[in-house]
């Protein structure tokens, strides 16, 4: 049985509209990820936007809980039911049906469709909810209904806002499987498994805690697909179901070790985390050191560390992608489409971590010998900063040893990096905007945009908002606010294209244009008093023409990238302005100069072809069949606007464009760079900006000709390079003539050197010292280009140079190693050089004593 599909069809038969799963990255600045089925409907529940025409909805929402308030990460792999990624089945009523229907529908689906035995089902209700108990008594006996308090059976979105009691449905998995002290109804054991939560949103909580009844109560329900699948398949752990076992079996095959449930936590962690990693990467989230990308990095590195425990020593997670696609690709077709690029990104990230994981674990284990109860915060910071161990990974390792972390010390050392920590929400949206948008929608609906046809329009002011987005009857001269016009030529920021600027002739300057819940609002700075009802002439700034050139060029660039680099390319972000364009896209490696030249040539070829732009509004199904590219995560209605340039490019797009590709003029790539792992960025200019770029480059060329004193620049540069080589040789010869005093001491008959070299080559000096001494332990340091280089040599002693370097390098923020007789490394923390020299002497003294 396809439980996901059965659930959706069941509620469609009850007149619910099927709603596709929203992207994991929510349209909500207060959340890192969609973590519940109701999140996409939050603005409806809070009243920010009106209810849809059909106030009944059903969905299967992909969710992630791995950060913030809802964080299941540390439990994953160690319990039968926790996941970082899961699917939430839910049915919703926006002021339509209430408790009776919600309870009846749930009972009918569980017992009628899923065929779960009625005698296995238990329910809980809020201790004050007599109505829910009475409704449940029509289905179950009173001895299988439990009343609980606010902690378990009262749900609220926040400190204020919609809230209400809830009723949870539990499945008894049997005393024969679970007989622990917590395996009773209401306990924390796994015998009684919560499968469905019915939330009855019937109150509004005010700031003083007062509850007021809502005029139109609503229903929000959530049922975990993974739990229901496990029960239907007769297994007592989600990980033993068909959603996870094929992944675990693949891990077994790769590592050639049999999975045993009792000791298989690492297998389960890997199976869970590869699902999360695949979905996030396929939806455009990429590995980074901040925000959502850092959560993704933490999850993958946690899985890699568990793989390391199993015996993996090289990338393996990427080999699991195809297995997940086989399980889930039928429902989420984008997984297969993105699998190639996702595998490349995962393999690269794994390879990065495998380079440091052994050294990091060695440092961790070394510190364990010095730890009784509290693990050093300094070492935890070093693991984080030097070896790439996320803090929760270190805490995970400590939990296995029943140890705690000196968190205060770790936080103290993190102060230098607080700017990064504060940016952890970068890319997750601006602050949540609250204002009188619902009233505008209910009163006027969306306004009319005529900017495709005209850049000038006589309009009437329907509404004004102050800077806090609240109603104003008028705006005085010299203040900022927002205007809502009945008809507007101003394009609202969307799809990477910046919002239009311009003026309301004689009244105000238009500073920006944005969309709020479908409302096209322009930010203005008034020049004289502006009132609701005023007639104005809205004029778009002339810079719009340059914006259209860059926007159309972005479309052509996107298509060319697909042809030149491969069909794994997908847009990861864009910016279109009057003076430049920026396009981010998935690609696992830097683009070669030859590829860049070909991309630039191909885009200019399409420009010179003079292709007429064509715009059509069609159904979303027609648009997809036409091959038009859509951006993942964008919300599209039943009808979409498709912009095409002949056979060169076809995309979903609501933006403004040139009429003919020839109007773009020319296209110049100014920069190619990496944004994060697996994401590249191309920056380019067109039109007037391209002419200005050419002019600047020509002037720069003239300046270089003057500086190298040669009209043939390459010949001039070659001459300068030759001079530099000669000067370097002279400098080296001079340094060789300078006698360097090295401090040598004798310990147990062995010559020991721990010193800093200011000039010369430290490796050559080590060799020279070896030739001068029968038995030697020497380590030399040298500061070069804001880094510390170090080399160690051993002769006639049991000490090992490689071990010496491995011990000292981390103190300087570096790493390295080598043979027993010679080793070298580099570090980036010059401030710790004195400390490193002291420790180097202490270490070697202990070894040879």
From Swiss-Prot:
It comes from Sulfurimonas denitrificans (strain ATCC 33889 / DSM 1251) (Thiomicrospira denitrificans (strain ATCC 33889 / DSM 1251)). GO terms for molecular function: alanine-tRNA ligase activity; aminoacyl-tRNA deacylase activity; ATP binding; tRNA binding; zinc ion binding. GO terms for biological process: alanyl-tRNA aminoacylation; negative regulation of DNA-templated transcription. Its EC number is 6.1.1.7. Belongs to the class-II aminoacyl-tRNA synthetase family. It catalyses: tRNA(Ala) + L-alanine + ATP = L-alanyl-tRNA(Ala) + AMP + diphosphate. This is Alanine--tRNA ligase. NCBIfam families: alaS. Coiled coil: none annotated. Zn(2+) binds at residues 551, 555, 653, 657. Consists of three domains; the N-terminal catalytic domain, the editing domain and the C-terminal C-Ala domain. The editing domain removes incorrectly charged amino acids, while the C-Ala domain, along with tRNA(Ala), serves as a bridge to cooperatively bring together the editing and aminoacylation centers thus stimulating deacylation of misacylated tRNAs. Its main location: cytoplasm. Pfam families: DHHA1, tRNA-synt_2c, tRNA_SAD. One of its GO terms (cellular component) is cytosol. Its cofactor is Zn(2+). InterPro entries: aa-tRNA-synth_II/BPL/LPL, Ala-tRNA-lgiase_IIc, Ala-tRNA-ligase_IIc_anticod-bd, Ala-tRNA-synth_IIc_core, Ala-tRNA-synth_IIc_N, Ala-tRNA_ligase, Ala_tRNA_ligase_euk/bac, DHHA1_dom. Catalyzes the attachment of alanine to tRNA(Ala) in a two-step reaction: alanine is first activated by ATP to form Ala-AMP and then transferred to the acceptor end of tRNA(Ala). Also edits incorrectly charged Ser-tRNA(Ala) and Gly-tRNA(Ala) via its editing domain. It is an enzyme of class 6 (ligase). It is found in: Cytoplasm. Keywords: Aminoacyl-tRNA synthetase, ATP-binding, Cytoplasm, Ligase, Metal-binding, Nucleotide-binding, Protein biosynthesis, RNA-binding, tRNA-binding, Zinc. Binds 1 zinc ion per subunit.
């Amino acid at each position: 049985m396809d439980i996901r599909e059965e659930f959706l069809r069941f509620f469609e038969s009850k007149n619910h509209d099927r709603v596709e799963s929203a992207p994991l990255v929510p349209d909500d600045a207060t959340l890192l990820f969609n973590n519940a089925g109701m999140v996409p409907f939050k603005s409806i529940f809070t009243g920010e936007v009106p209810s849809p025409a059909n106030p009944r909805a059903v969905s299967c929402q992909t969710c992630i809980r791995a950060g913030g308030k809802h964080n299941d990460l540390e439990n994953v792999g160690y319990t039968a039911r926790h996941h970082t990624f899961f699917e939430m089945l839910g049915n919703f009523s926006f002021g339509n049906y209430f408790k009776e229907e919600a309870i009846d529908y749930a009972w009918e689906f569980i017992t009628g469709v899923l065929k779960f035995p009625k005698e296995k089902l238990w329910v809980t209700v809020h201790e004050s909810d007599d109505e829910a108990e009475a409704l449940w008594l029509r289905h179950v006996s009173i001895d299988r209904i439990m009343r609980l308090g606010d902690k378990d059976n009262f749900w609220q979105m926040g400190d204020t806002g919609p809230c209400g009691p809830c009723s949870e449905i539990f499945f008894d998995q049997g005393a024969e499987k679970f007989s622990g002290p917590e395996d009773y109804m209401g306990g924390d054991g796994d015998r009684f498994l919560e499968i469905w939560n019915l939330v009855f949103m019937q109150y509004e909580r005010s700031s003083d805690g007062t509850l007021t009844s809502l005029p139109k109560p609503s229903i929000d329900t959530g049922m975990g697909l993974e739990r229901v699948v496990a029960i239907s398949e007769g297994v007592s752990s989600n990980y033993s179901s068909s959603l996870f076992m094929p992944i675990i079996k693949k891990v077994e095959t790769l590592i050639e070790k049999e999975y045993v449930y009792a000791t298989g936590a690492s297998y389960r962690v890997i199976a869970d985390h590869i699902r999360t990693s695949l979905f996030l990467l396929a939806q455009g989230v990429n590995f980074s050191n901040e925000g959502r990308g850092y959560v993704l990095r933490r999850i993958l590195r946690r899985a890699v560390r568990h793989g390391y425990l199993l015996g993996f020593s090289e990338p393996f997670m990427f080999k699991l992608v195809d297995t997940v696609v086989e399980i889930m690709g039928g429902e989420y077709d984008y997984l297969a489409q993105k699998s190639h690029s996702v595998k490349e990104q995962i393999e690269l990230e794994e390879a990065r971590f495998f380079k440091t994981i052994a050294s990091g674990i060695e440092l961790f284990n070394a510190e364990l010998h010095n730890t009784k109860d509290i693990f050093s915060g300094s070492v935890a910071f070093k693991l984080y900063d030097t070896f790439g161990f996320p803090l929760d990974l270190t805490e995970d390792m400590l939990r296995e040893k029943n140890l705690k972390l000196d968190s205060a010390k770790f936080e103290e050392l993190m102060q230098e990096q607080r700017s990064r920590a504060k940016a952890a929400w970068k890319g997750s949206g601006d602050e949540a905007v609250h204002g009188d948008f619902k009233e505008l929608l209910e009163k006027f609906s969306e306004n009319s945009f005529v900017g495709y046809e005209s850049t000038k329009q006589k309009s009437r002011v329907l509404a004004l908002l102050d800077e806090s987005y609240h109603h104003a009857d008028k705006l005085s001269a010299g203040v900022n606010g927002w205007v809502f016009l009945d008809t507007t030529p101003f394009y609202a920021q969307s799809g990477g294209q910046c919002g239009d600027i311009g003026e309301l002739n004689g009244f105000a300057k238009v500073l920006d244009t944005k969309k709020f819940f479908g409302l096209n609002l322009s930010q203005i700075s008034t020049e004289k008093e502006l009132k609701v009802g005023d007639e104005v002439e809205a004029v778009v700034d002339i810079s719009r023409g340059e914006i259209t050139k860059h926007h159309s060029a972005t479309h052509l660039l996107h298509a060319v990238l697909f042809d030149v680099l491969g069909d794994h390319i997908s847009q990861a972000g864009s910016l279109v302005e009057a003076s430049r364009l920026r396009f981010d896209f998935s690609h696992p490696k830097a683009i070669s100069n030859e590829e860049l030249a070909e991309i630039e040539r191909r885009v200019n070829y399409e420009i010179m072809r003079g292709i007429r732009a064509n715009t059509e509004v069609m159904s979303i199904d027609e648009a997809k069949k036409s091959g038009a590219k859509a951006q993942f995560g964008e919300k599209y209605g039943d009808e979409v606007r498709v912009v095409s340039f002949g056979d060169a490019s076809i995309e979903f797009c609501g933006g403004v464009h040139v009429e003919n590709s020839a109007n773009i003029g020319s296209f110049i790539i100014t920069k190619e760079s990496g944004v994060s792992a697996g994401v590249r960025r191309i920056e380019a200019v067109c039109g007037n900006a391209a002419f200005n770029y050419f002019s600047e480059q020509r002037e720069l060329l003239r300046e270089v000709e003057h500086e190298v004193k040669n009209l043939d620049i390459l010949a001039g540069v070659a001459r300068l390079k030759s001079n530099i080589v000669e000067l370097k040789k002279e400098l080296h010869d001079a340094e060789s003539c300078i006698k360097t005093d090295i401090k040598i001491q004798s310990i147990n008959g062995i010559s020991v050197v721990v010193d800093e070299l200011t000039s010369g080559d430290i490796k050559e000096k080590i060799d020279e010292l070896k030739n001068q001494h029968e038995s030697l332990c020497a380590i030399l340091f040298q500061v070069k280009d804001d880094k510390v280089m170090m080399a160690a040599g051993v002769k006639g002693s049991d000490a090992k140079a490689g071990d010496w370097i491995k011990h000292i390098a981390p103190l300087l923020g570096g790493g390295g190693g080598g043979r027993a007789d010679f080793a070298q490394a580099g570090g980036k923390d010059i401030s710790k050089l004195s400390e490193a020299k002291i420790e180097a002497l202490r270490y070697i003294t202990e070894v040879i004593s």
